[in-house]
UniProtKB/Swiss-Prot annotation:
Golgi membrane protein involved in vesicular trafficking. This is Golgi apparatus membrane protein TVP18. GO terms for cellular component: Golgi membrane. It is a multi-pass membrane protein. Glycans are attached at residues 12, 24. It is found in: Golgi apparatus membrane. InterPro entries: TVP18/Ca-channel_flower. The chain crosses the membrane at residues 25-45, 51-71, 96-115, 120-142. Keywords: Glycoprotein, Golgi apparatus, Membrane, Transmembrane, Transmembrane helix. One of its GO terms (biological process) is vesicle-mediated transport. It comes from the Eukaryota. Belongs to the TVP18 family.
Length: 171
């Protein structure tokens, strides 16, 4: 049985409450993006067993899920050994407008999967469409991009980021 104290230690509850009160669309976009990571990976794997061209869209969904993971959880860029080109690519998505356009392209790719066959990849397309819309609303409202406090660890993450070289040497 999982205790409430354990769950509170795993998630930054005070950060979640602060995020809800912020009324910032970029934070809501990040929350939906966390779901999109799960959707892309789960439905990508589930649809890879089709014997049609849907396999291509399944593989694309899995890759999209991994790219979203690195875009929405920037701490992973610090601890995973990645190429400078990939880090530069991911770092470009630092505004609401750029993220909205990125998600718009990704959802358009997944909507094209319907041409081949209607599958559960529609869930991925809908999720990416919602994320693109939320980020576009943030850009239209002129809101500054902010990172969510859900995954932060009350200051410990900031201390870890300063010791980036130590983490990379350990890996």
């Amino acid at each position: 049985m999982v205790s409430v104290g354990f769950l509170k230690s795993m998630f930054n509850v005070s950060g979640m409450v602060a995020d809800l009160k912020s009324s910032n669309f970029s934070i809501y976009g990040q929350w939906i993006s966390y779901l999109n990571i799960i959707f892309c990976l789960a439905f990508g794997i589930a649809n890879i067993f089709h014997f049609s061209a849907v396999i291509v869209f399944s593989i694309i969904a899995i890759v999209q899920g991994l790219i979203i993971l690195f875009i929405e959880v920037p701490f992973l860029l610090k601890i995973c050994p990645l190429s400078d080109n990939f880090i530069g690519f991911v770092s470009k998505f630092d505004t609401n407008l750029r993220r909205a356009l990125f998600y718009l392209v990704m959802c358009a790719i997944q909507w094209c999967s319907i041409i081949v066959q209607s599958t559960s990849l529609i869930v991925v397309a809908v999720g990416l469409s919602i994320t693109a819309t939320v980020y576009a609303l943030g850009a239209a409202a002129g809101q500054e991009f902010k990172n969510s406090a859900i995954l932060s660890d009350r200051g410990r993450v900031a201390a870890s980021v300063t010791n980036e070289a130590v983490v990379r040497d350990m890996l």
